[in-house]
Amino acid sequence: MAFRLKLCPEKTNIDFFWAAPVTFGFSVFLMAASLVAWLTLGLNFGIDFRGGTTIRTESTQAVDVAAYRAALEGQDLGDISITEVFDPGFRADQHVAMVRIGAQDATQSITPEQIGQVEEALKTVDPSITFPSVESVGPKVSGELIRSAILAVAAACAGIAVYIWLRFEWQFALGSVAALIHDVLVTIGVFALFQIKFDLTTVAALLTVLGYSINDTVVVFDRLRENLVKYKTMPLRDVMNLSVNETLSRTIMTLMTTLIALVSLLVFGGDVIRGFVFAITFGVVIGTYSSVYMAKNIVLYLGVDRGGPKKDSKAGTQFANIDA
């Protein structure tokens, strides 16, 4: 006998749309508040978007990220990111790290003298350390990365809209895109409010959130489309409630299993990936909310064409009066 785990009873009848104006208004408020936080507080851009210097280190000793960071704390260099690099092609005694130092103003990166101070500070931790390369990213390149990131998110939303439009109807596409914009904007608003570092990994997290959110939305939309055919005389609101209730167990299980992995990474993953994991963790939660209370509310307000093709009353009677 197959064992199926169900978090909800077979028949649930939760009215998700009893306060549709309130939930929709709350979603709009979240978007507006996030936009205000973004425009007034700004984002705490990382080195990728602000510019800076990257120093590659190599040593025969194991990389001690904590010791490297402690040695550089007294240099007054601002934003510093240290990550160990792993590659199957490295020798057994080849240990590589990347030290990224953010630009301290909008016009230039750190000076050669400061780079020398960084190298000397790291040599006090590991005398065998070497510095094969030093690369700097200027504000112009950082600005291009910002534009590319915006284009990537916009292209993802546009592609998803076209897909939903072709598979369902334009009302579904509009609801889906509104939910995606809601998810991205609210997540960015949280980053602005708490001044969490925003870099290229955060953009990757936002794209991941878009994929998760649209997957959750499409599952309910697909069930809604089936039920619209099955229950042709049932009011649209009741059909939508039925569809959300029928997929509720799947939605909760997907969310919980995803959060188990993400919370573990958030707690034990360390500082390097914390911003990335936080963006996904918050995004999947807000995405689950928006898939019901943003996307479905818009479809409910716009309505759905349930008439289908009209039958021809003369069909099949063309030859009724012809004598045999």
Curated annotation (Swiss-Prot):
Specify where it is mainly localized. Answer: membrane
Report the subcellular localization: Cell inner membrane
Matching InterPro entries: SecD/SecF_arch_bac, SecD/SecF_bac, SecD/SecF_CS, SecD_SecF_C, SecD_SecF_C_bact, SecF_bac
What is a single molecular function from GO for this protein?
A: protein-transporting ATPase activity
Q: What are the alphabetically sorted keywords of the record?
A: Cell inner membrane, Cell membrane, Membrane, Protein transport, Translocation, Transmembrane, Transmembrane helix, Transport
| Domain of life of the native organism | Bacteria
Subunit and partners: Forms a complex with SecD. Part of the essential Sec protein translocation apparatus which comprises SecA, SecYEG and auxiliary proteins SecDF-YajC and YidC.
| Protein family (similarity comment) | Belongs to the SecD/SecF family. SecF subfamily.
Q: What name appears for this protein in its UniProt entry?
A: Protein translocase subunit SecF
This protein's species is Cereibacter sphaeroides (strain ATCC 17023 / DSM 158 / JCM 6121 / CCUG 31486 / LMG 2827 / NBRC 12203 / NCIMB 8253 / ATH 2.4.1.) (Rhodobacter sphaeroides)
Report which gene this protein is encoded by.
secF
